[in-house]
């Protein structure tokens, strides 16, 4: 009787690995990017640095305003008590236009902390430059009153001062405030110029460059070659267990399962 053989593959041969079932060059492997970029975000260290500069600019502006108010107070008091003395500092009205210059510089410096615009930055630089010239002019006129063309008869260190000595001491205090103002315009201008957030271009945000973000769970290696796929398929078939059934009689079959051979009957 002619034997009829049937080959039944085992369960382990029902499916191949996903990289063997698909073609060697997969679309998702070639088209999907291995890395992507994050959106532009505010860098923490740059944000902290920007906040420190803004705080410093605010403090410098507060010093400007304080010295301006002191100039107004001392200048107004000097103008009210001086009668017969010829003071260049009052004839030139330095305590008032100097105070106005310092006040505008301080207000612009504080405003830049809230509204960091390009035109405000330029205005702040210009007003601080003008304040520097005002300070130099004030030093000249006060020094002329106290040292060069002094209208005071008594020295400032007199033990029993009169009204003239009081005026001289007030002008000396005004000189001290002017010297303090001398150290403010340049740091204020530099801090305003080196600000990191020129909001006219990036809407008040300091942005960092795009950085690569590696996606987890996606393959980043190149696709396997055709030879490696064929070799892997051959090795898989060698380990695959095949079942061969031969019918030797109407009710008898010989089953070969690779490792063993047995006979199976219909009963």
Curated annotation (Swiss-Prot):
TM annotation in the entry: 62-82, 92-112, 122-142, 172-192
InterPro entries reported for this sequence: CD20-like, MS4A
UniProtKB keywords: Membrane, Receptor, Transmembrane, Transmembrane helix
Coiled-coil regions listed in the entry: none
Cellular component, GO, one term: plasma membrane
Regions of this protein lying in the Cytoplasmic compartment: 1-61, 113-121, 193-267
Annotated compartments: Membrane
Recorded superkingdom: Eukaryota
Extracellular side: 83-91, 143-171
Pfam families, sorted: CD20 (PF04103)
Biological process (GO), any one: cell surface receptor signaling pathway
Membrane topology per record: Multi-pass membrane protein
Main location class: membrane
Family stated for the protein in its record: Belongs to the MS4A family.
The protein's role, per its UniProt record: May be involved in signal transduction as a component of a multimeric receptor complex.
Protein name: Membrane-spanning 4-domains subfamily A member 10
Organism lineage string: Eukaryota, Metazoa, Chordata, Craniata, Vertebrata
